[in-house]
């Protein structure tokens, strides 16, 4: 059994899109989780050859820190890399074509902090600088990608929603509340959705899961001149604050704080305000709560959740990366990939079904410490 212990191997989130480091820290309650991932990869019928596995790992930042990481398995080789456009941290493991089993276990201890700038009143009197100039790393999140278009029908939506509003914070809030009123969750969608914004808006089927809804938020914000990005990650347990509105929509765990989170992948979003930094938002979870609890848009619980999730996040969740429409490293047969919120694997170039833990054969368990 090969083992590799790596403590503090996950450095800060690279150079991409840093917020203003001179502002106060508005992260509040801290949480500590033990997060264990177990893989026993199943070779698809008819596939043969070398097996390659790419696992997304959490980044370190002001609101989340990987305190330790340890991985072991019967792999031929395994290492951590950030060698991709977005610096998305990746554990890459490979098994030779004659391997009888393909085992990997990853154990992490992660500290997260609730992000609550809006709760703390940090944006109450926000006024944008007269001359807004974004750094090169922030400008990256104004650009279009194949799934995040910013012209054509995508540009038409914020033009209609925002009218003559010029304050970026108020523009983002108008976009968020448009989602609350107009987009719904569709549990039949595979995984977290593919987040094809142009397709969603062109068809007029304003439904989907978290990647669909929050990708539309990101695209509309970018089209309105506001830097924005998704963050692909996973829920780690129960939501102590938001749980009063729904026991299941925002994450759950047993009485011992243990949760099977194999299906807990969740995409969030954030937008950038000049002179302040990145602001959290999660329009998709408003739709998820509405569906789970059968609430109307006008219901007081819906409105309370919508208010909290603009400018705040509860940290029973950890983020992996902001990567979209990019190439993993080493490059797989499928390139580029849409996003990197799930593990990805190929056997002889044939992809495994990342969205089905039983078919792919992975098991994720989180425990609150």
UniProtKB/Swiss-Prot annotation:
Signal peptide residues on this chain, from the entry's feature table: 1-19
Matching PANTHER family: TRANSGLUTAMINASE DOMAIN PROTEIN (PTHR38339), TRANSGLUTAMINASE-LIKE DOMAIN-CONTAINING PROTEIN (PTHR38339:SF1)
Phylogenetic placement of the source organism: Bacteria, Pseudomonadati, Pseudomonadota, Gammaproteobacteria, Pasteurellales
InterPro entries (UniProt xref): Papain-like_cys_pep_sf (IPR038765), Transglutaminase-like (IPR002931)
Superkingdom: Bacteria
UniProt KW keywords: Signal
Protein name: Uncharacterized protein HI_1048
Entry annotated with the keyword Signal: yes
